[in-house]
Every structure is written in C-alpha cells, then in structure tokens.
Amino acid sequence: MQKKKSLNLLLALMMVFALVLPSIPALAATSSMSVEFYNSNKSAQTNSITPIIKITNTSDSDLNLNDVKVRYYYTSDGTQGQTFWCDHAGALLGNSYVDNTSKVTANFVKETASPTSTYDTYVEFGFASGRATLKKGQFITIQGRITKSDWSNYTQTNDYSFDASSSTPVVNPKVTGYIGGAKVLGTAPGPDVPSSIINPTSATFDKNVTKQADVKTTMTLNGNTFKTITDANGTALNASTDYSVSGNDVTISKAYLAKQSVGTTTLNFNFSAGNPQKLVITVVDTPVEAVTATIGKVQVNAGETVAVPVNLTKVPAAGLATIELPLTFDSASLEVVSITAGDIVLNPSVNFSSTVSGSTIKLLFLDDTLGSQLITKDGVFATITFKAKAITGTTAKVTSVKLAGTPVVGDAQLQEKPCAVNPGTVTINPIDNRMQISVGTATVKAGEIAAVPVTLTSVPSTGIATAEAQVSFDATLLEVASVTAGDIVLNPTVNFSYTVNGNVIKLLFLDDTLGSQLISKDGVFVTINFKAKAVTSTVTTPVTVSGTPVFADGTLAEVQSKTAAGSVTINIGDPILEPTISPVTATFDKKAPADVATTMTLNGYTFNGITGLTTSDYSISGNVVKISQAYLAKQPVGDLTLTFNFSNGNKTATAKLVVSIKDAPKTVTATVGTATVNAGETVAVPVTLSNVSGISTAELQLSFDATLLEVVSITAGDIVLNPSVNFSSVVNGSTIKLLFLDDTLGSQLISKDGVFATINFKAKSVTSTVTTPVKVSGTPVFADGTLAELSYETVAGSVTINAIGPVKTVTATVGTATVKSGETVAVPVTLSNVPGIATAELQLSFDATLLEVASITVGDIVLNPSVNFSSVVNGSTIKLLFLDDTLGSQLISKDGVLATINFKAKTVTSTVTTPVAVSGTPVFADGTLAELQSKTVAGSVTIEPSQPVKTVTATVGTATVKSGETVAVPVTLSNVPGIATAELQVGFDATLLEVASITVGDIVLNPSVNFSSVVNGSTIKLLFLDDTLGSQLISKDGVLATINFKAKTVTSKVTTPVAVSGTPVFADGTLAELNMKTVAGSVTIEPSQPVKTVTATVGTATVKSGETVAVPVTLSNVPGIATAELQVGFDATLLEVASITVGDIVLNPSVNFSSVVNGSTIKLLFLDDTLGSQLISKDGVLATINFKAKTVTSKVTTPVAVSGTPVFADGTLAELKYETVAGSVTIEPSQPVKTVTATVGTATGKVGETVAVPVTLSNVPGIATAEVQVGFDATLLEVASITAGDIVLNPSVNFSSVVNGSTIKILFLDDTLGSQLISKDGVFATINFKIKAVPSTGTTPVAISGTPVFADGTLAEVQYKTVAGSVTIAAADIKAVKATVGTATGKAGDTVAVPVTLSNVSGIATVELQLSFDATLLEVASITAGDIVLNPSVNFSSVVNGSTIKILFLDDTLGSQLISKDGVFATVNFKVKSTATNSAVTPVTVSGTPVFADGTLAELKSESAAGRLTILPTVIIVDSTVAPTAVTFDKANQADAAITMTLNGNTFSAIKNGTATLVKGTDYTVSENVVTISKAYLAKQTGTVTLEFVFDKGNSAKVVVAVKEIQIVNSTITPVVATFEKTAAKQADVVVTMSLNGNTFSAIKNGTTTLVKGTDYTISGSTVTISKAYLATLADGSATLEFVFNQGASAKLRLTIVPAVVDPVVTDFAVKIDKVSAAAGSTVKVPVSLINVSKVGNVCVAEYKISFDSSVLTYVGTTAGTSIKNPAVNFSSQLNGNTITLLFFDNTIGNELITADGQFATIEFKVNAAATSGTTAEVKVATISSFADASLTEITKVATVNGSVKVS
C-alpha cells in the first residue's frame, strides 16, 4: 500500500512539472554571460557613435564567442551607408591577453516594419571564426566607432540604447545579448525577434562533373519565416531550379552551383525578421582524371606471332560511349595479323572496329545504343596480334607501339574526356645460335648404374677455355656413383674436376695452359654415372642444368649458352633390399671416451669394411661393429662420417654412420709484442699465438696510432705453412687486418705456438719520447679444423719512440692580388722555415664562380720539377704535390715560391674580394719521411668590374581584334648589350585568347637552332640560346617574337592583359646575368555579332489508348547551331516511345544526330561532325517523337516538356541562350475494360489419393500476362503436379508454376506479346493434390490468396474477381503395413547392404521388428535408419543378439515425427564372413510378430516378406594398369597427356594428386579406356607430379608427370669488361649493349649501392650509357657493376679504373715522348718532340737514347720529325736491343738548326698479338748523351717527359 502511494505522489509531481516548467524562464541561458556597456563619446551631436562593450562568461561551461551576438539600437538619422570601425577587442584569458580586433563583425539591420522615435536601426556585433573561447570568469572588451559614409552627424540623445551618464561598463538593459540565436538578456525596443540561423554556414562544391553534388544546410527559424535566397549581387535564386526546400532543409542545386565561377560564392538566406544568414560556398574545379590506355610490352621470336593487349584504366563509373585510338608501329619489323576487341567491349561485332594502314592502326569504339553498351570498367580494350619479321644480328630489337595523333574519348553524354596513352614495346629476339649444354636421357633398373651424358654443341671457333655448370637431380631417386670427363676434354686429370653437394653436381673445366688444351669441338663434356634407388613403380626423374652456366672462350671472353634438360627413367626391376645399419648416428665425447657400436642388417650382402679405417680401428662380433675409442680420440671435433661398404655379386651398397666428436676447445692467446725505436727508424713487432690446438682460419685486427707509426711491411710467422697461399694482410689507415685460411682445410693448419706475423713499423717524428699502444681491436675470429669457432684472449703491445731532435714548423703562405674581370693574375704560394722537405701535399680552395685557373707554374725552390712536382685542379680545389723522386738529393731546402697559380677573373658587377686559402690539412715530410708540423696563411684576389651592365627592357605590345579573328602581339627587346641566352614567360587569359602561332623576330639569328617556344595553358615560354655561345648573340634592339592570338567569343568589349610573368632570365656573351625590366601589353576584344536566343518548342497531340501519335520538337530563332543537347521528359506510365525521327533542318543526320531513351527521359543529341559546314541554319523541326499511348480508363492530358538544362552552341562552339516551350499528349480510352473471374474448383478424395482441382478463367478479354497465387493447407494436402489448361497456348514457353510451402504461384506470359494471348474462357491450370493422412474426414479450402495480376495485349492491367474452391477428404481404406526384407549379393570379406522397406504406410508412431539371419555366414557390421525415419538419433534404435536383430521405432513426439510415407525403414549392413567362400543363398527373414501402431497408438495390421543374401565365390582381383606411367609436360610446348587404361574387369573411379581429386570434364576427360589430362591442368603444376588413378577395386595406378618449366634465358651484356681512364682528356662514357632475351632491365648495382637512372646512367632501347661523371667517382683499381633484370641471373661488367695521369708542367727545355693507345697485333706510331726550345735558343746537336718494353712492343722503325731540316743528312737512328739511339747534327752548323718546338722523330712499334688489354708499355728517355747549341756550347739542363703505349 505504501509503495502505491509513493507512485501516485511521483505521478502527481510529474504532472505539476509538466504544467509549470514551460512558463519558467531559461535561467541557465540568462546566467551564461553578462554584457556591460557605455558610450565613450556622449556628445548630443557627433559623427561617431562609440560603444564600449564588455562580455563576461558567468557560467561554469566554456562560452564560444562564435555563438554570441550583442545588439545596440539607435536612429540612423539618414539613409547613408554605415561602417563599424573596431579599434580594439581584447580578451583576458587567465593570465594571457589575446587580441581579437580582427575577429569582431558588425551587421547593420534597418527596421522597416515597426520603427519608433528612438530606434530605426540596430547594429549586431558578433565574432568571426578564429575568435577566442571564454572560460568561467574570463571576459572580452570591444572598443569601436559607428560612422556614416559621408561622416555626417548622428543625434544620440534620441537613441534607444544610448547611455549619457556611465563612464565605465555597466549593465544596460537596452542592449540585448543572444547565445545561439536566443535572447538571454536585455530588452529590445520593439517585438523581440531572434535571428534565424543555418548550419552549416560553409561548404565546398566541385565543378568536376564526376564529383558534382547538391549542397544542403538546415535552418533553425527561431519563429521567423524563410523568404528567399539572394546572391552577392542581390539577385534572387529561382526556387524551382536553383534550390529546393523540404521542411527546414534547404538544398542548393548542383546545376546552379555548376554555373558559378571558381572561387567563393556567398548566398544570403533572408527571413521574415532578424538578420539574413550567409552560406559561403567554395567552388573548385578539380581536373577530370584522364582515361589511361596502356599498350602492353611483350617479347617474341623472329618469325612468330605475339599478342599485344591495349588496356584501359581509370574508366569513369558513368562509362565511355566512344573511343578513337590511333596507334603507330614499325611496319618494317612487325606485321598485323589480327585485331580483336577485349572483354570490356560489349557487342563488339557492332560497337568495335579497327583499320590498319601502313604503319598505323586505328581502334574505334562506339556504343551503338548510346547508353546500354558503354565501356564501364577497366580491362583489355583490344588485342593486336603481330607477326615479327626477320631481324639481322644477334641483338634483340626493341620496337615501339605508341600513340599516333590525338586520341578521342567520349562519355555517355558524348562529352570529351582527357586520355593518356602509355606506349608499349615488342622486343624481337633473333634466332638463337648460342652454344647449348644438354643433359641426356637413360633408362635403368633400380639398384643399377645409368650413364647420363652431358654434351656441348655449337662450340665457338675460339674454343672453350673455362666452364662452370651445375646439374641438379632428385637425390631421393638417384645417387652419383661417379663423373667422368668426355672425349672433348683434353688432359682431364688437370683440367677437369667436379663436386657433389646433396642434389647438385658442380662441373668445372679450366684449360690449365690457357690456350693449347681448349674444348674445340662438339661432343660429350662429361658422363654422370647415377645409381638408381628403389622405386615402387616406373618413374622418370628430370636431370637438369640449374643456375647459370659460365663459359669463356680462348680469349677469356664470355660465351653465351642455353640449356636442355634430360632425365632418367627408373624401372622397378628386382626387389632391392639393401643392407642397413642401426643406429646411423652416435656421439663420442673425448672427455668420457667409449667405443661406438652399430648393428648391420645385411639383407644378403657381405660387409667389406669401412672406408679409411683399418681392421685395428674397429671390431666385429656377429653383425655388431664397434668403432674403437682409441681411433675416435684421434679425430678432430665435429661430425665424422664413416662409410660402411657392402657387396652382393656385381651390386654394391653403402651405409653411413655419423659420429659427433665433442671436446672442450682450448682458448687461443694472441699477444702483440713491444719494441723501442728512434724516430725515423724501423722496428719489428711480433704477433704470437699460444695454446694452439689446430687452427684452420684466423682473422685478427690490430689498431695503432697512424700519426706516430707507419706500416713498412708485414711478414708471416714460422707457424704459418704455405704463407703465399694461406696468409694475407691488409693495412687501412690505422688498422691492420691479419688473415689466415688453410686452403687445404686440414693439411696446413696452424698446429703449434709461435709467431703468427711480424709487423715492421717506421716511427714518425716526435718532439719527446712517447709510448704508443699496438693492440687487438674488434672481435678476433679463430676456428679449428672443423671450422668450429675457438675461444680466445688477447694481450696488447706497444712501441716506444725516442725523439731525435727539434722539429721545425713549415709556413705555407698564399699571396694576394688585384685584377679586372676577364684578366689574368698570378697568386704565389710560398714556403718559409723550410727544414728540408722530401714530400708535400697542399690543397687550396677558391670560389670557382669568380675565378678560373688558367695555369700553374712551379716555383724556383723545386728541383727537377718535371719529375718531382705536379698539380691537379678539380672544381674549386687545387692540389699541389711535391715528391723528391731521389728521396734525398732533390729536397726543397730553402724558403721561396713553391708554385704560382694564374687565375682568370670572371665577370662581376661590383668590386669583390674572394679568398684563396689552404683547405684541409697540409702534409709535409722531411728527408726521413718524418711528418713536419705546419701552419698556413690565407690569401685573396680582389676583382674589379670591367664595364657597367645594361638593363634590358622586354615590352609586350597591344592590339585590338574582333571575336574569332587573329591578331599579332609583338614582344620587343630594347637596350640590348649582346644577349647569349634569354628565357621569358608571357601570361594571358586562356578563356579569352588562344595562341594560333608564334613567329621569331628579326633580331634572332639562326632561329631554327637558337629559338624555341612552348605554350602551356595560359602561359607562353620564349627561349633563346646562342648555340655558338658568341657568334649569334642578339646584338640589337627589336622584335624578339610575335605572338599570334585568336580571340574567343565575347558578348561585350573586354581588354585582357598580356604580360611577362615570373622572373625573366637574360645573360650576356659571358653568360653573366643581365638586369631586366618589363612592360605589359594587352589585347582588346570586341564582340563580332549579337547572340540570339534559341527557342525549343515541344508540340501537342491527342491519341487513343494503344495508338501512336507524333510529337514534333521544333527550334526557332536559329543563329547557326553546331551542337545541341536537349532532354525531353514524359510520363512513362502513360506513354511509350515507339520511334524518333530526325527533322529536315538536320543535315547528314546519320552522322550528326542521335537519340537515347532512358526510362521517362529522351535525350536528343546533335553535333555537326564537320564543325562548320553542316550547321542547323534555319528554323524547323529538330526531331519528331512517336509515342504509343498506354491504356487509360478516362481521358488524361500528360505533359511532354524539356527537362534539365539544354545546351546549344554556335559554329564557334560558343554557348547560346535558350528558352523552352512545353507540350503535351492527351490520351482517350479506346474501349471498356472487362473484369476477369478466376474460379478455383472443388474435388473429393480419400487419404493417399490424388485429386485434380481446376482453376478456370471467365469473361476473358485477351490476356497477355497473369499471376495468380493459390493457398492451401499443407498439413492436409501435398501438390503432386500442376498442368496448364487448354486455354493456354504454347504452355512450355508461356506457362510456369512455383510451389512454396502452402502457396502455389501460377504464372502466364505470352512470350510473343500478342499472338498467343489467352483469348477464351476455360481451364487456366489444374492442380493435382495428394491427400495426406488425417485422423478424420473434412473439407479444406483451396482459394486465391494475395492480389492476382492480369494484363491485356497492350499490357494494360485488367480488373478481376475470384471464387474459392475446396477439397473434401474422405476416410481411406486401411491396408496392412508390409515390411519387406531386401536382397543383396556379396563375396567373402565384402560388406553388403540389405534394406528393410515399409509400404502401405498411413502414419506410424511405433514399430518393433525382429529379423533372423545365419550367423555362421553373416556378421552385422552396422544398422542405419532409412530416410522415412525422422529424427533417427532419438526415435530409432536396434539391438543385435546372436543371429537375431531387433529394430525399434518410437515417435518421441507422439505425432509430429510419424513415419508418413513408404520407403526404406532401415538398412542392415552385413559383412560376409571369410569362411563363406563357396556359393550359397542365405535367408534374412522377419521372425516373430511385427508390431506397428498409428498416431493414436492404435495397432495396425501388418504382413512381411523375407529377403536373402546370395554369397558369390571369391574372385581374384587383377589390378588395373595405365600406360604410359611416365610423361613429360613442357610448359613451353603444351599438349594434353593421353593415358590408356587396362581395366582388368575393374571400373575407373577418379584421379588424385596427393589429397586433391581432379575434376572430371575440367582437369581430364574419359573416352572409353583413354583418359586425357588437360594441358590447362598440367600447366598449373611444378616439378614432378604423381597422379594416382583410382579404381573401384584393386590397387591404384600411378602416372609420374615431369613438368618442364619454361626456360629462362639469362640476359647478357656486351662488353663484359671495360677500362675507364680518369685522366680528364681521356674520360669517356662506357656504352653497354644488353641482350635482354625476353627479360626486363631493372637496375645497375655497385655492391649494395644502386646507380641513379638519368644521372649515373641513361638507357636508349637496349643500350646503356654509364656516365663518365659517375665513373670518375669510383676508386682507382677495379670495380664490378651488376646489371639486374626482372628474372634470370644478373650480368656483370668488370671495370678497370685507371688513375688520372697528371702530366707534369714542364717549363724547361725538354725531350717529350707522347702517350698513345693501340690494339694488340696492330702497329702504332709514338711521336718524340723537343719543347721549350726558346729556353736554350737553338739546338745544333742532339743525341739521346730511348728504351721500350720489348715484352709488349716490337721495334719497326724511326722517321725524322717535322722539326728536322734536311733529315737525310742531319738525322739518324739506331736500334740496340730495346734501346733506340736518336742523333741530330746540323751539318751546316747554323743554317739547319732546330729553333722552335716541334716533332723531333716518330718511332713505329708493333704491339704483340698476345698482349693483354689494359697493359701499359713504357717508352722513356734512357740517357741524354749530348745537346749543344749553334756555338756548340753544351746544353746541360735537359728535362724529359716519358711516354707509353697502352694496349686497348
């Protein structure tokens, strides 16, 4: 009772709150903020109203100022425009002050409805985005001024909100505040009208037609009424076309937005009261994504055909209606065989076509329906099948298939789409003449030996000097017995070897003589003798060449090769039982030694011993073999494999025992010794190893102080055997790496303690005694004879260096100089405080943008400079090098100039001083090569400008033109100083102007070479470059270029600027940049003629239902129309388009006109295909639409009108204005409508019988389609069948029915839609019901349910009525249930099924049935319930007892799971006992009295019939066989595999591959006894596949398929070796030609570094050019570049990097021998010259000797040079060994002197044919015998420059 009273009280309180709450003001809102206010200017008359407003957040939650509005009410005192000036707005946010001045907004609202004497205007203050948010207690203060546009006075005393007294912010109730549009404080002067709001207030619209979408916003009206939307100009939007309103939701039409310009569109929402609200829409126009056509890249052999696909991607979802794709190909290399449409092309026979003309292919697509067969997805557009023509040479030819001309792609509206085309290639491979390495085939029995030859064919004439090939085989089937060299291998014991590793054999051949024992003919290379292992059936196993074979010819040039696989077929043969041992693994621990035992199972073999062991190493007891611990203790740690040998007649066998030998390893100690040495002397530091137990490999890294010590040499210690092979060392900076590897991996181990290596250090200079460590750094590596890693420890050493005297500090000083631009100046580099310098390396840096090195001359403190001094200039760096070649006699021994650098100054516009300084760390060493200390002094060069720089003026001209015409706009240059290069960008408005052409001006010389221009959108780029860099400068003022613009259509006169944009670049003849200024131009465009407004009028018509009427669409006020798109809408429920005919104003309509009908819309399209000569030029009918009227019951007029936005354009494709006039069609009914009656008949029958119930139709008007649904009680009736009645014509096509539970759906559709109507009354269908068992009789309804549908011949709906029927069920005669035991046949061991069936079933709830059988012959395997038993796991059970079976059924539900139909009650599965081998018939009978009861558990009558089981005699099963049992499937030459079965009385069942079963009809087919395995299935397999043929009895048969993969031919390169010389004059790109062999080039790698394409190398076709700039960065010596391809092995280019040779700068009189190159076997001439003759005046006598390398060069002869006058008298030469004496003597002693530099002699050599490429043979001056001048005074100072011959 108390609870009920509480509930009543709560309910009463809720009712009170419901009545009271609406009248309570929103306290939370009013308390959310306070607004305080005062006027700072209180003058009665003033030109400025100055409100001060303070807004404070008084609530606990944040106050978003974007939601806040404050209104000030006043009289505007005039109609002038007004402005609010926000002087300051600051928010105090905690301790931070935030300026919001720019965020304050003000909106002036004029009161027009009810102004008062104190108010006709209010200003509403708000905040823009980015404003502050106020937390509790925070405030913002606004200070500002309101003024009129003419600054006239306001009268404030009559203003509603004016406060004349306050001087600080106070609450002013006449100032109102709003949050979220709701007023929260203050009182307004008139009605309190809050502003409406919209959300969102901003949006984005994309003009891209694929992305256009309406823009929506929602209004919160706040009691106001929405009025209009206006744009920024005040123009109202059209409420029916520009936007729509649904409730408070406003949708701005995408059609309206699509007309707006890119940028910002502001729409004002206007309401009945309050402020207008702004919706700001950002309009963008993203580019339409280009449809991409990609032509495939394929390979083909010459003479064969290949398919090249053309794929389309980025197909728009709306689809493509038309495509025209012109392609070009190399018709000299390719021939078009066929072109087929791809799978994305629907109805290709109509929509697709192609043409081939010469080397051009045109692919054409046009959706003939213009809508229903568009290309709508990515995929193959077309496939071009080419036949490759023959090519010459061995290099593959790459030919392109690419775009020719402009592709045309159009969408469903025939709007052009951008299209990009990616070119394809066809690589034609030449006929393959490469050498082939082939593996043979063999057949062998298991256990026997098969010899498999490996042959070489097409051996090159240059022979094979080296070969490395790898052969793979299946080690589970084959074992290598031996490998023998073939007869083409000479001296095989020396030249041939092989290794076997698992399933791989490596074959190695090397002609040890490198020439005299080459493989020079085709034949057997090797024979591999395989021993076949046991198999259970015949199997063929592949033997293949794997990896990439390597062959080189007699010149060691790489020989390309191809491979062919072989196989071994192994037959079962005699059963093989090979001997075995157990166990096959064991462990021996040296710390706990014990014998190792294993037991042999000989299987008829004899044990013959253990390989490598004597009988003392093991013992035998019976079949047990023990390996003695004494033998095992001697073995090294690791796995020891012992081979047990057996024999059986001529058969041999082995078994292997692997013993793991274990022992704790020793710890090796590596000790570095100590030593003491004087600075400049050498000392030996030993590295010793102790506790050595047998070391096979060692890697030891030592570190030392390279500023104190220098490694002179490293020698191996005496514990290292064969050190020239096993020991090596590497010095890198301050690190030494010592490496040891026993090359024999066992016989040359380090086996004792001692010195491992001795390091000989030279001590550098020190100023005081110092001890420096030498120690092991990093992680040492030691391994024993098994390559197991050893532990280690290290002991550090040291070297103590004693100082030998004070060290001087050398000072290197760079001088200073001043020079004018373009002139040369000398800058000396001097050395002071010189102690005696043997070597110096000095690097100078300078600004290469200001200075250029002209030359470098050696200073006078350098002796023998041609030998001892050199210099190198690299960019902005100079390296000066000095080395006393005598290491003592030519030291720099005094202070002075080391070198003078002659700089040429570059152009500057003002004086600049640039430093020249020593960079990096100089290196100086004294005569002992001890390093010297140094310091440097920097220098500089001051550059003064040579002349002032002019300022070039580029002026764009002006012009006037009419729309559609062309006008010339010149671009002139003035104040030209001489211009070598110019780049000028001109911008214009591409919506108004189009570039027709650009012509070069007369001031440009050789314009075809020096001038170019590029037009890109609205930008023109003008480019000039004097190709001669001097002789064709622009040297005078004048026109640079003339731009010819075509003016586009305008409706009013407009002037558009044409101006230089960006930053022009001009440079003079020295490429120094020039100053620039520009003058803009313009083009004024005048309209050519007024634009007409086209009127499109749809006509009207009247028609009767079912008839056709013509509705014309006419055009009037036609100005000349090139394109028109018109959409006509109609009501498709009333009208149907019969046809559309083109009007007479359309010329060439089959090309220019089309139409598309889509639902209730007709699209009429016109496009003058000539774009000019077939315009619509007169008023008249554009098209006539022929409508067929549908059936109506009363007269109706339906509109036919232009919908959407029509598009018209004139002959210039300028859009035309238009207006439309709607039409209509009036439809009158043709005749009255009949009402069809559908009647379901009645029938009577007994349970179990079938009765026919007819469904008849009457009052039939002519029915084309009918759908009738009939309902019945499915618990009482079951549909047996449904047949069509006699009023249904062609029922197999027109009639169908569906039964679903208790519902029948009967369907009729006249497939002809007219000639097979139901036209008379009669039976529509007959339903044959079978009556189910029921407990009592009764009548059940059969009636039409749902809503029938009937339609006449016009498909107009026909009215109907229905009459229900029924089935009366009478009691059935009760028959006895009969239980029948079935019969079966089987043999001993078989399991056979004996069914027990029930018939005359009327609904059984329980069954008990007992069967008897002969238990001496039969055994019950299982008993399963039959399909008439529902829920058998619950309702069914059985019991077997001896020879009796009891079967029980009880419907656990006692009603819903009765046995209700005849069928199998149970199946007894008998197993025939193995003793029943003879023929017999044994009965299986029903014994006792069966018990059956119905659903009421009333007992049913029953009867039974016995069964029997016939036992057949045992039959011997013969296994089925197949032939062949082994096949090879070649993926390169695919074919089905046919297998013949010998069934032997069995039946073929299936084929299995492992656990997978092949699919018949897909993976294979069967024809009688032949099974054909599909090549499509075989192509998916890899390796060896075993297919198991399964039969109904007997064993399965197996077919082994060896799948041969498509051979990948490795790509190759030519050449494979190359030389790059770093000498600047000799640097050249390295060009490599690739033979791709069907592969694709991927990259080039140098180790782990990938070269950069386009920078480090370039590709043109199959040619790769490696940049000399990249090659110059490689380290001197050798380098290997790896060419990587998408498949197959990479190819390697081995490079020899020759260091730069810096010829010394020779300033003295000298003999100079040139350096030349020549090929092996060729002759070469070496010039010998005299230079700097002026230094000695003249030469009268010259005698000197030249030596040469006779191992490379053979002397041919010498001829006098051009410097020799009268050579027959004055010149002679003589050869003595490898020395040539040259003699000159002016016999006149004065008249035939040598007075100038020139060629003294030419020596001719022949390069030995055997000389190796890259070898350099020295040709040098051996002795200077005598030189004298005209006074016969001896010339004592003669320098020499030696030469050489390099073998190329």
From Swiss-Prot:
Record domain Cohesin: where: 291-428, 435-570, 668-801, 810-943, 952-1085, 1094-1227, 1236-1369, 1377-1511, 1709-1847
Keyword Glycoprotein: yes
GO biological-process terms attached to the record: cell wall organization; cellulose catabolic process
PTM comment, free text: The N-terminus is blocked. Glycosylated.
Pfam families tied to this protein: CBM_3, CBM_X2, Cohesin
Matching PROSITE patterns: CBM3
Domain of life: Bacteria
Subcellular location: Secreted
Main subcellular localisation: secreted
Keyword vocabulary terms for this entry: Carbohydrate metabolism, Cell wall biogenesis/degradation, Cellulose degradation, Glycoprotein, Polysaccharide degradation, Repeat, Secreted, Signal
GO terms for cellular component: extracellular region
MF GO annotations: cellulose binding
Domain CBM3: 29-190
Signal peptide range in chain numbering: 1-28
Functional summary from the UniProt entry: Binds to cellulose fibers and coordinates cellulase enzymes.
Protein name: Cellulose-binding protein A
Species in which this protein is naturally found: Clostridium cellulovorans
Designated gene of the protein: cbpA
